[in-house]
Every structure is written in structure tokens, then in C-alpha cells.
């Protein structure tokens, strides 16, 4: 045993000997300016443990600071700034070999940064005698760290923060200062350990003019002479933690980092620092609130300087700062109370906009206003959390999983505030077993199922939920005991923990406010369950300048809703419509049928009990925002549901009910007539009734273009059918709809084989010279049928071509009719500043309200020269480019010059005729226009082409448009693309 101990001691002494032998040569080489080899560094690794300078205990070398700051028993700090009492500590001379590196004056000069050599030259000369007279005492690194920490904290308590300015001498040597930063960082440990205790005290007690250089963070150091600022504080995280209970946050002053200095290089002039106490006195007292951002550990700068620094360093445009949830605070300033996040600011904007309108205010009662007022009285974190939860789907949420770090790291106090104010429900009101089970994650649900001996380890969540629900339906065998469902509910709630859900009573109030604000949005795209998240984001984009709407005058004169109950009925109908649409999209036709029948019963009850004459008096473009219009849309979708379920007789009955009225959804009458005739003729084989439906549909003035042609074509097929000869006399007297055919051409292309055969056809074509430059000769590209046709017409001399379908002409229509579309003087077509078109654009009212202006513009275009047309395009493009308009796709033309070249080919006469037709019935004329527009800039010739792939045919709307374009003098044709083998495309 003794021999083993001896060997261990010998080994340890041997290591110490090697260490002393290896360290000294390196120090000598360093002092002589040489560089130690990297191999010697790896051969002589430092020891894994070091002796504590206070208690002598061996601790891991990487944890020496943590041991001294938090674990060492001999490290004591007394109050009133007294010195630390160190007992049972080894002498400084015993630790000299580990904690100090003695150098000659020449060596110290060699290792000193140029910054300290130049900036401190004057002070060194003036005080050379005094510095030589002072005794030199070696102080261990740990002792110096604790002394600096204690003295720095004491000075911050007694005298606050010392204000510093840049001296003239430091300004002259700014370049040398920048070059010396790397050396300062590397030499800081050696520099700090060489200073004696007296000098360290003098450094902290002296108050010279400090430079604008950053002081090194996370490094314990003292400065050479008076070039270091007197307000140097240690930044050891453990010391700050130990003193956090003694020092107020307001008085904490920390050092800047070397990174901050790199940023300060952009500014050659010094920054005038203000009094810290003044700045902090202006801050809000609620700094401990969950909403307030913690105080930054950096010197204070003015707000103007902060913004300049951010713009210079980050190169961020000024308008992009509005996009942030919280204002940025630069690295050299304390964070001030932040601005509100965009979703809360915009939510407040919605509330103000709705409640400022007198007609909208009438739609809320005292209880509604009380709810809104209670929300406004919430704290800022409470309002932020409520809006966040309002934007989510209405369901129960586990509090532990609700995380919004921008609000607070601990949301429990905020949740308690919302519960106390009646905005949130707690788990005490959670009584539905299905809701609790859906709330649990899969692991907890499996544990719950194991408790009741259900499921296997790999069971899916839905299977576990169904199994537990089925088990809950069983009754207990013993009287007086809780049933199984109650036991499962109790266990599930225990597993879920604290849960909350928005109160429905308060949520519906804000939902109605949002509904009034977003009334003009496309209803299918606006998910009511999202709490208007899309609209709030739209407001954010507008406020930040990233989204712009056309300029127009909001003019409201008509009252949409008669009273509060009318608004509530409309909201209920809208939710029912959304539920039906969701069920249809998911393919749940039985569920959709149940929702449809429920809505039909509700609509019948409203018709029997309410006076709807107010809705009938509204113009048709406002009537679509009524409860009657919404329920009629549900009934129209019910026809599709009934047809999916093969209930054609019920579908026919519903279609006849819809056609019996002409107040709601009048733009769908043509589609209803067409569907009624199809069901009667094809599914129910009631041919005579089908002929009657065709006759009534053709005579209906509200049935438009494509649907009338469809009815006429059905009658023609019935007339030619051999099995329906007995009905030819009935079919002879029907009104006729004549459409003349246009030119048809056929090209061939190699079809790309793909599995399934579904979707659009994909063809292969040879790349052109420009396209094949990167891939060499013989490059083959995959393309659509329209691209294949474009390449074909390019070979015919049409150097320009666009595949835009109706968007090409609607864009030209919007550009040349912009001022008329957004003209003043038409009431109730603009209800809020976020509309992309007037509300009457898709109705007959659009043309009726602007008849004179539209006809005058059409006449002007008819007589206009090419230069006039191009000037009109350029003028609108330059003033309105980028504004969101339902008619214009700003990316349809690559440049305004391309649009100008197209109108030069089309001519004013042709454009006038097209625009006049679109203005009269945009709802039914926006579709059916040709796919391609190709033209030649050299010959000013153009061609309008409808492309049809394999097994594709023209629709009724396309046939009507082709005939109308032909009548206006356009060169139109239908290009059929047929699939072929590996041969190239060629025209027949």
C-alpha cells in the first residue's frame, strides 16, 4: 500500500516537474518575442485540476471561478464595502508559479498593446517617479477578481455611474486604437494579473477621462495607468447572481463587449452619454410587468442615436421597423418600454373603426359595450394573450402548452387575469368527455387507456379516444357508484391539468365586430374560426407600406342591418354556411346533409317570424350581405349535396323552390335552370317537364350567356334523339341561341407518359436556341399544352405571346378604365379602405350607375390613336402600379412597354367592344376568354387562340366569347393539340 502511495506521489511530483520545465521555456520564448511551437503546446497540456487560491482545495480548472464565487467557504463578503476575509488560504508566494508571470520592463513593453503605449505615454512620463516608488505586490487572479467585483459594486452603490467623454488624445489615435483591440482581448488576463492590489484600488478610485473604446466583458482585468475608465465593473455572471438581491436593477452598470466596439467603428465621433438616473426616472414603474422587456445591460444612448446605429449597422429601411412585433433596441442602449405588437394594434384599430360608425354602434347593446370596455381595461399582456387566443380555433387548451414568449415567459398570471375578468373558462367548466380526450396528447392518452385496460402500445390516438368513449357509455354494475364516463372524465382532467378556453359570450361580441369590419371580404376565403387573422395581417401590411389599395372615397348611406338581432341572424347564417362548405370539402356528405336540413329549417322559421322587407329593398350588391342571401346559398349547395346522395327528386324540389323567388342569389338562376333540366331529363326521365324547364330558362332575363346556350344545346340534342320523336313539336317552339363557329387548327406533340392519367397533359418539346444554350443541342423540355402552342405560333412569326386567359383582358380593362371603376359619386360601393374593387362590379348595377362614363370612355377608345392608348396605359401604370386591384394582375405583362405593344396591335375599336361587354356583365363575362394572345411587334398582327388538349372541348362560355371576338374583327382560332409518338410537332 505504501509503495503504491509512493508511486502515485512520485508520479504527481514528476508531472509537476515536467510542468515547471515546460512552462518556463515557453515564457522565456514569449518574452523574447518568439512563438512557441504548437507541438510543445499539445505535449504540455495544463493540469485538469487547480488549487483554490482561497481554501487550497483541488477543483477542476474550468470550474475554478464558479468554485470561488459560489462554493468556496473562505470567500466571505461583508456589508458596507468591507474587505473579504480569507482564512486558511495558501500564501501568494506559494501560488506565484500558477497565477503570475513576472516579466522585465522590456518584456512588458513588448506585450503591451499599441493603444496603451501611445495613449498612456504622457501619463506614464508624468507619474514615473510615483509608480516606481510604489511597492509591487503579487495578487492572485481569484483574489483580484473578487476585489474588483466588491469595489465596483460598492462604487456603483455610492456614486452611481461615472460619465465619460472621449479625450482629444484618443481621437488622434483612433486608428491605432482599432488595430489594438485584438491584442487587448488576448492580453487582458496577463495584464490584469500583473497589477498589484494598490494599483487596482487606485484604478477604481480614479476618475480620468475615458475613451470611447469598449471595456472587455467576461474578463477580469485592471488597466495600465489612467487610460482605463474608472467605472470598470466585473461582468462575472456568478458575481452578478450573488449580488442580484442586494443591488437594484436600475443601478446595474455593465461593461461593453468587443463586439460592440466593432459596431462603434462606423462612428468616428463620440456619443454624448446622458445621466443614467435621469433616463431611468422617465421609464415606467411597471418594469417588472410580464409585458415590459428586461433592462438591457449596456450603457444608455439617446433614442435618435439608437435609430441611427440600427440603420447604419443593420441597413434596415425605416418602414420595415413597423413590421416588428416589438421595437428593436440597439446594442448600446437600455431597452425602453416597447410598442404594441401588430396584432394588438390592428385589433384595436378594428374596434375603433367599427364603434366610430353610428350605424354599427346601434348593433351592440349595453352588455356588448361592457365586454368591449372590460377588454380595454385589461393589462397589455392580457390584451395580447386574448387576441392571440381569439385568432385560434375555439377549443380547450392546456395552460402549460400555451407559449407566447413575446408576451411573457410565465403566462399564468396573465391567464388568471383573463379568468378573473370573465374572458376565459377554466377546467371546472369542462364536462364533455370527448373534448377532454381530444385535449390530451397521445402519450398521456395511452397511459389513461392502460389504466382502463384498453388499447395496445401502438394504438392510434383516434382509436384510443373511440375506445374510451365506448367504455364511458357503459353503466356501473353497482348502484350508487359513479358511472364509467365520470371516472374517465375525472382521470382525464387530472392528466390534462389546468385548461382554459375562451368564453363564447365575449368571443361572439368581438366576432361580430370583426364581421362588420371584414364584411366585404370574399366569404369562402375568410375563415371565421381564425379570428380575422388574415385581415389583421392585411392591416399590418398596409401600415408598413408593403401593401396598397386603390384610392377611393368611402360613402355609406344604406343601413345593411336593421337591428342587433338582424346582425346576429346574419352571423349565425354565415357560420352555418362555413360548416356546410367544410363538410362538403372533406367529403362528409351525410354530415353536410344534416347541416343543410338544419339550416333549411332555421331559414323557414326566420321567414315565418321576421319581416324581411328591409332586405328586399337593398340594392343587389348589398343584398348579398343579408341573412336571406346567405341561407339561399346554403340551399343552393344543398342541391349538390342531394345529387351526391342520389336524391334527385329532392334536388328537383329544392331547385324549384329556389327558382320560385327572384330576390336572393339572382346571379345563379341560369345555373339552377340548367341543373333542373339535366335532373329531369337524364336522372328522372321526365322529358316533358325537362322541356318546360328549358323553355322557362331561355325566357328568364336573369339567366345569362353560357347557361342559356347550354339549355339550347340540350334542347337540340333532345330534338335529334330518335327516342324523343314525340317531343319534337314541343321543342320546335323554343327560343334559339345562335353561335357561329371559328377556325380550328391541329398540331401534334409528344405526350409525356405519366402514371394515373389524371390532371393536365404534359408534353415534350425541343428547346429553342436561347433555352438550350445551357444544356447543349438536343435539349428536351417538359411543357404544358399552352406552352407547346405558344412555341408553335412563335415559329409562325409571332414573337410575343401571353398565356393569361381572362386575366390578360381584365388587366387591360382595369388599366384603361381605372378612374371609372374607382370613381366617386356612387354610394355604398366602398364600405372600408381595404377593398380591391367596388361592391357592384359583379352586378348589373355597375354599368347602370356609370352608364354615361362607361359609354363615353368606350367611344373615346374607339376613336383613339395608338399613341393615345399607349399614353393611357403608361399614365395609369406609373401612378397605380402595385396597388391591389381585383381586375389587374401586375405581373401579367413583363413591362408596361409589352402592354403598350399589345394595345397597339389590338386597336381601340376592338378594345372598346370587349370592355363594353365586360362592363355590362362582368360576373358572367370574366370567364371563357381565349387562353393565348400572340402578336408580332414588326407587323402589328395578332391572334387570339383557345388551346384544347386531348379529350378536351369548348365550354359554352368559350363558344360565346369566340363568336363575340370574331364579330369585333379579331383573328381567333381554336388550336387542338393531339398526342403523337416520338416525332416532333407539326401542323396539319
UniProtKB/Swiss-Prot annotation:
CC annotations in GO: nucleus
Q: Which residues form a coiled coil?
A: 636-663
Ranges of Basic and acidic residues composition bias in the record: 99-111, 167-182, 272-283
| Names of required cofactors | Mn(2+); Mg(2+)
**Which catalysed reactions does the entry list for this protein?**
Hydrolytically removes 5'-nucleotides successively from the 3'-hydroxy termini of 3'-hydroxy-terminated oligonucleotides
Q: Point to the regions of Low complexity compositional bias.
A: 224-238
Q: What is this protein called?
A: Fanconi-associated nuclease 1
Task: Report the gene name.
Answer: fan1
